Amino acid sequence: MTEIAGKLFTWINTRLPIVNTFERHLSKHPVPSKVNFWYLFGALAAVTLIIQIVTGIWLIMPYSNTEEQAFSSIEYIMRDVDYGWMIRYMHTTGASLFFAVVYLHMFRGLLYGSYQKPKELVWIFGCTIYLAMMAEGFLGYVLPYGQMSYWGAQVIISLFGAIPYIGESLELWVRGDYYISGITVSRFFALHVVALPLVLIALVFLHLVALHEVGAGNPEGVDIEEHLDEDGVPLDSVPFFPYKVLNALVAIGVFMTVFSIIMFFFPEGGGYFIEMANFQEANPLVTPDHIAPVWYYAPFYTMLRAIPDPLGGLIVMAAAVAIFFIVPWLDRSKVASIRYKGIFSKIAITMFGVSFLTLGYLGTVGVTEVRKTMSVICTIIYFAYFLLMPIYTKYETTKEVPERL
């Protein structure tokens, strides 16, 4: 029996390079021997993506993508489908934690220069993944057809109307009707469960292929490829499997514990994961007292509200996301890691982080004059971090980077 299995494996391996692929990307793929916890969020993002895909498949089975039955089918899932409540809460909790770990993953990239040469494509693919996530999250947000889903979608889609000349036609084309209706739900459903997941999977594949081609970074910003042994393997590296895989499994265990606690005991997340208004069916005749996006869109929604002109707000909001794509060419520093950059880089990234968190908070609360002023200030700080980067990274005094880890 063992001999037959061995021959079968050999037959398959000569036609499908299983061993070579495993060795190249796992058992013999060199990764830096010294990294910190910031480098675990990529693995956690992959775990949450898998959770979203699996739970999403189960949710679409009993879900009905019609205006009349969308909300009631969610209630049916929650009340009558075996473990339907758990699958739904896994999906909603997973959505929020997916964005949380991706935000931390992106922040790590800014901290340690994970966009510098030759990692530009790795960064660009990552930013495109984030853009696809935003679209995927918005489309899924509309599907429960609750009050906040309806009015939130109404506000966001109406932004297209601010574009000169083509705005009204584009708004109608996106919505598919003159108001949020079953047509909108149906087309958003198709995009959410088929089109964008395929795009996400393809982008993640390209992101990983590009990463494995140029090699992973490290907190020191040291290029481990500069010091090789007689076999051409970096001296300051270990095989990805089993060392980093086992390390990631510990982090995944802790993450899933936190995930489970939230899912079972705080599934609504205090109204941040699932808004209380979304437990009511959409009513086009009744506007909620306060229309706010899900927390992971809140910083950009705050920027939108900070600009009085609708078109100006739309441009600022779009630019806030798009500017990440050009970071590799904005940073003129000779060192990658924040550990060895100058004081201006450290102050700038601290102010950027504080402004982003403040914008996130302001996007979840009502508008007052003080909050509007804070929104404008934080928006300016947000963009200043990027736009002034070519100046402060070029002229600041940096520390000497060690030759090896």
Segments and roles (model prediction):
Residues 2-97, 101-405:
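Membrane-embedded and interfacial regions of multi-pass energy-transducing membrane proteins
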